[in-house]
């Protein structure tokens, strides 16, 4: 099993994040989803809140507002309606 997975965060305007990360906490409609390498496939409605992740040992975050979350084959795609 890999130690990292690919995280992509995009809005209709731009690609905000494309990085190999070791973990992520993502706001879904009904609460936060914790993602680690090897996570099972998942499709979920994105909530509003702070998306945080660890890349190269550094904790980073941004705020997302609605959209979709997809987890598949050690790739996580967040398609957000808005983010900052």
Question: Where are the language model's segments positioned?
Answer:
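Compact, glycine-rich, soluble single-domain proteins
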Residues: 4-84
């Amino acid at each position: 099993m890999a130690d990292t997975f690919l995280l992509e965060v995009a809005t209709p305007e731009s690609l905000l994040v494309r990085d190999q990360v070791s973990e992520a906490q993502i706001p879904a409609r009904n609460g936060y989803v914790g993602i680690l390498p090897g996570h099972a496939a998942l499709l979920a409605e994105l909530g509003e809140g702070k998306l945080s992740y660890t890349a190269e040992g550094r904790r980073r975050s941004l705020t997302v507002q609605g959209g979709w979350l997809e987890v598949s084959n050690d790739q996580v795609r967040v398609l957000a309606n808005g983010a900052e």
